[in-house]
Each structure stands twice: as structure tokens, then as C-alpha cells.
């Protein structure tokens, strides 16, 4: 059992016979009255999103989630194909299942696929990835004095903010959990 006060992004639990993953949460402590936890939940099976409020002391049944590392192979435009490294079985996933991770995944990279009762429902990119910048404004000499940022498009299509001194064609390390630039490689 998990307490509603312990809910965090990515926590998966069962509620009313359905399995939900926390997308967003907020602990609210009003000046008058009892505290509560406001959550935005995604149904693991249907993909539907709902907002629910919990008492922080409410107990929820934690769902048993299997995590498996798989290799991202390719996309045919609609589906994204991942391969199990042990059985070489390929599984297709739709955009809703991969939307958070796919912007940081190149072909042949490894990712964590989450399964509930044998059905894949979510993809987690590695915490840090190294990607090349394919489009950004050129850096100008002397732009290292401030911590100003500029948008840069990566080879996967993701757009991240990078310091002014980073140029097109360079490879950078990105934190996939936040989408933030970490360093040049």
C-alpha cells in the first residue's frame, strides 16, 4: 500500500479496478481546512487523463509494474518498434505510449519499457543522452559571460535551450527527465 501523500510523478497504482500513472501532483495545504493532494492521472490501459483529489492519508494499492530494457529500432510513421534483447521479439507501440521518451531516442538506443500484466504501456528514455545539434543560431565570440540561453533543435527533433556559446553540429548531453542541457561532449 502507498499513501496518497507519497505520490510522485511516475508512481503507478490501482484505483477502482483501473491502473493509473501520476502525470502531475500538487500538495495543497489551505490556511483553513485539511490538506489534500491534487493529481493528474493517466489510465495505463486506455490512455485517458483524469484529475483526482486525495486525502494525504488515503491508502492506494501499488501496481506491480515490470520494467524491461529494450532497443528502439525504427518508426514507420504511426508505430514505434522496440526489440527485446533476449528473445529478439519486436513490439510496436503507438505515439501516446512513447511521447515523453521518443524525442530523445535515436534508432538503436536502449530504453526502459514498462509492462502491466504483459502489456506495454510506457517508455522511459535513459536519464542522459548525447545528441547532435542540427539547427541553432551561431555563437558569437564573447557570449560566455552571461548565462543566457537559445533554442537548439536536436537530431531527434527535440528542442532544448542551450547556452549561447554552443553551436550547430556540436554534440551535447541532455537530461531526459527535465529536457535540460547538461554539457558539451
UniProtKB/Swiss-Prot annotation:
Gene: efp
Pathway: Protein biosynthesis; polypeptide chain elongation
CDD domains per the UniProt record, alphabetical: S1_EF-P_repeat_1, S1_EF-P_repeat_2
Molecular function GO terms recorded: translation elongation factor activity
UniProtKB keywords: Cytoplasm, Elongation factor, Protein biosynthesis
A GO biological-process term: peptide biosynthetic process
Localisation: Cytoplasm
Function: Involved in peptide bond synthesis. Stimulates efficient translation and peptide-bond synthesis on native or reconstituted 70S ribosomes in vitro. Probably functions indirectly by altering the affinity of the ribosome for aminoacyl-tRNA, thus increasing their reactivity as acceptors for peptidyl transferase.
GO CC terms of this entry: cytoplasm
Record InterPro entries: Elong-fact-P_C, NA-bd_OB-fold, Rib_uL2_dom2, Transl_elong_fac_P/YeiP, Transl_elong_KOW-like, Transl_elong_P/YeiP_cen, Transl_elong_P/YeiP_CS, Transl_elongation_fac_P
Record-linked PANTHER family: ELONGATION FACTOR P, ELONGATION FACTOR P (EF-P) FAMILY PROTEIN
Organism: Clostridium novyi (strain NT)
SUPFAM superfamilies: Nucleic acid-binding proteins, Translation proteins SH3-like domain
The keyword Magnesium is assigned to this record: no
Protein family per UniProt: Belongs to the elongation factor P family.
Superkingdom, taxonomy of origin: Bacteria
Protein name: Elongation factor P
Gene3D superfamilies: 2.30.30.30, Nucleic acid-binding proteins (2.40.50.140)
Amino acid at each position: 500500500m502507498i499513501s496518497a501523500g507519497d505520490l510522485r510523478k511516475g508512481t503507478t497504482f490501482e484505483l477502482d479496478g483501473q491502473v493509473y500513472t501520476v502525470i502531475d501532483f500538487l500538495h495543497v495545504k489551505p490556511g483553513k481546512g485539511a490538506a489534500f493532494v491534487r493529481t493528474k492521472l493517466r489510465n495505463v490501459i486506455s490512455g485517458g487523463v483524469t484529475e483526482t483529489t486525495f486525502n494525504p492519508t488515503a491508502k492506494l494499492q501499488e501496481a506491480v509494474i515490470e520494467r524491461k530494457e529494450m532497443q528502439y529500432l525504427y518508426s514507420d510513421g504511426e508505430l514505434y518498434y522496440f526489440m527485446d534483447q533476449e528473445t529478439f521479439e519486436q513490439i510496436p507501440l503507438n505515439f501516446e505510449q512513447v511521447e515523453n521518451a521518443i524525442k530523445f531516442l535515436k534508432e538503436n538506443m536502449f530504453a526502459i519499457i514498462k509492462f502491466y500484466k504483459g502489456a506495454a504501456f510506457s517508455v522511459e528514455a535513459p536519464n542522459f543522452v548525447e545528441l547532435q545539434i542540427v539547427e541553432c543560431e551561431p555563437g558569437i565570440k564573447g557570449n560566455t559571460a552571461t548565462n543566457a540561453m537559445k533554442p537548439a533543435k536536436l537530431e531527434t527533433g527535440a528542442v532544448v535551450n542551450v547556452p549561447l556559446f554552443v553551436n550547430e553540429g556540436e554534440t551535447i548531453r541532455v537530461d531526459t527527465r527535465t529536457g535540460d542541457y547538461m554539457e558539451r561532449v
